[in-house]
Amino acid sequence: MIKVTGLVKKFGANEVLKGIDLTIDKSEVVVIMGPSGSGKSTLLRCLNFLEEPTEGLIQVGEYKVNAGGKIDRHRKKVIRELRKKTGFVFQSFNLFPHKTAIENIMEGPIAIHGKSPEEAKAIAIELLAKVGLADRADHYPAQLSGGQQQRVAIARSLALDPLVMLFDEPTSALDPELVREVLLVIKSLAEEGMTLVIVTHEMNFAKEVADRVVFMDEGLIIEQGTSKQIFENPKEDRTKQFLSKVEAIVAN
């Protein structure tokens, strides 16, 4: 489903990703965790070329792109197709403020997949029901809570029928009482067998849904394993240090 080989990302002299190798299978739920500045979000953004990698190979489904390749029409087309297969949900909701919830979701199927307004509306209605917002179809973002806006953002990404969903700390901008409603939607996607890659600090959620946990630090994958292995019996000292700090913060 996803294969990353030798992925390097530099911002000037700063090497943020230092040769990442990662394979994610179809229907697998992978949680990426680590301290701030470890390269988690950059890795996620490289997976669908929101960030152009410096070196390495990225494959999503049948679409394979080498980093640093010649920017020609064929490469642009492959990247465009790869992006269609990867839904991306950001920390901030990035909804169009002048469009209603249903209009936000309709935008992608019409603009990218060439659907008719009627077809796009049917897709949007189904997805709003899926995320528990059927009664908010005609509300504008300003009329929705943060949790509701993020659920619309998830529905908008699902409207493009992606192979994989990428979540970049989807609850970090939410008030604590709104976090669970978003996590429940993500959990339902996992239960349906969708391939998910999630950057999150929600450790209990990771324990609950992750097939595999990847711990990153300083641009490297330090350790990976099942959620049980990582949370109950981490092998690397750096992983143990990180988890103990997170647990201390949660306890307080």
What positions do the PLM features span?
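ABC ATPase NBD coupling module
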Residues: 65-87, 117, 233-234
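Catalytic Walker B motif of ABC-type/P-loop ATPase nucleotide-binding domains
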Residues: 165-168
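ABC ATPase "signature
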Residues: 224-225
